[in-house]
Curated annotation (Swiss-Prot):
Gene assigned in the entry: hisG
GO molecular function: ATP binding; ATP phosphoribosyltransferase activity; magnesium ion binding
GO-annotated biological processes: L-histidine biosynthetic process
UniProt family annotation: Belongs to the ATP phosphoribosyltransferase family. Long subfamily.
Keyword Transmembrane carried by entry: no
Protein name: ATP phosphoribosyltransferase
Name of one Pfam family that matches: HisG
Record entry for activity regulation: Feedback inhibited by histidine.
Known catalytic reactions: 1-(5-phospho-beta-D-ribosyl)-ATP + diphosphate = 5-phospho-alpha-D-ribose 1-diphosphate + ATP
UniProt pathway annotation: Amino-acid biosynthesis; L-histidine biosynthesis; L-histidine from 5-phospho-alpha-D-ribose 1-diphosphate: step 1/9
Upper taxonomic lineage: Bacteria, Pseudomonadati, Pseudomonadota, Gammaproteobacteria, Alteromonadales
The entry's keywords: Amino-acid biosynthesis, ATP-binding, Cytoplasm, Glycosyltransferase, Histidine biosynthesis, Magnesium, Metal-binding, Nucleotide-binding, Transferase
Origin: domain of life: Bacteria
């Protein structure tokens, strides 16, 4: 693959998605070393360049075809698409899949002393946010007039500083809101990290590499959601035990040496194996129960 056809992937330079994005790519076998002073990191073993940029630059870089792939929060993607549509700029990209990190919600919040009934309680008030387009869309759908206060950061301090009556900001646990005397009132958007692709046509070798990376990402995500289960089971309760294994597909059943009344079961479960399930397995005579994480899956 020539220099001009190297796969370019944009990831967040710093912030809540940065480390998880790097971890995901390394789990997919992409080797690279990040120099905090440099924008670009070159892969050591694949024709891939990582561009480390601000998260709100990633959607535009993908939509304009500057990079081929981007890992971004859905909230940032949606905000940029609304903005670009309003300006008549290219706003198309291909969302390849959601990822298993970066979960958050964009919510309205008000001071604890505020008498909030519903969203109409914010009629005519000033709301601070870093997501004016998502907020505007929500408030228009509700038929609520408001004044916005655009901030790039530290949105949660706006009411206390006298800049706004309420806020619209990302929430993960709510601890930051509580620390600033606020409480969450409405969730207006739920978000996960996702991987997006440019709509520009790709050379065959580059598209093949994209497909390979996506296949590996699918395998990594599936592995995180799955567990490898091993146990010994009495033959007389075998069917009941298999039925208890959550999400198991065609478990492998093997005979045990010198024990015709028991078998070994190996299974991949796509759901969590909870303690109560393990206790039920034990009650049915299962023993030597092992539940192990899976690093990678394919096929």
């Amino acid at each position: 693959m020539s220099e001009t056809t190297r796969l370019r992937i944009a990831i967040q330079k710093s912030g809540r998605l940065s480390k998880e994005s790097q971890k995901l790519l390394k789990s997919c076998g992409v080797k690279f070393n990040v120099n905090e002073q440099r924008l670009i990191a070159h892969s050591d073993n694949m024709p891939i360049d990582l561009l480390r940029v601000r998260d709100d630059d990633i959607p535009g870089l993908v939509m304009d075809g500057v990079v081929d792939l981007g890992i971004i929060g859905e909230n940032v993607l949606e905000e940029e698409q609304i903005e670009r549509n309003s300006l008549g700029k290219p706003a198309e990209c291909i969302k390849l899949r959601e990822l298993d990190f970066g979960a958050c919600r964009l919510s309205l919040a008000v001071p604890t002393e505020f008498n909030y009934q519903d969203a109409s309680s914010l009629e005519g008030l000033r709301i601070a946010t870093s997501y004016p387009n998502l907020l505007r869309r929500y408030m228009q759908e509700k038929g609520i007039n408001y004044r916005d206060c655009m901030l790039k950061g530290s949105v949660e301090v706006a009411p206390r500083a006298g800049l706004s009556d309420g806020i619209c900001d990302l929430v993960s646990t709510g601890a930051t809101l509580e620390a600033n005397g606020l409480y969450e009132t409405e969730v207006i958007y739920r978000s996960m990290a996702c991987i997006i692709q440019s709509t520009q046509s790709q050379p065959d070798d580059k598209q093949a590499l994209i497909n390979k990376i996506l296949s590996r990402i699918n395998g990594v995500v599936r592995a995180k959601e799955s567990k490898y289960i091993l146990l010994h089971a009495p033959t007389e309760t075998l069917e009941q035990i298999v039925a208890l294994l959550p999400g198991a597909e065609n478990p492998t059943v093997l005979p045990l040496n010198d024990d015709t009344n028991r078998v070994a079961i190996h299974a991949v479960s796509t759901e969590d194996l909870f303690w109560d399930t393990m206790e039920q397995l034990t009650q049915l005579g299962a023993s030597s129960i092992l539940v192990m994480p899976i690093e990678k899956m394919m096929g």
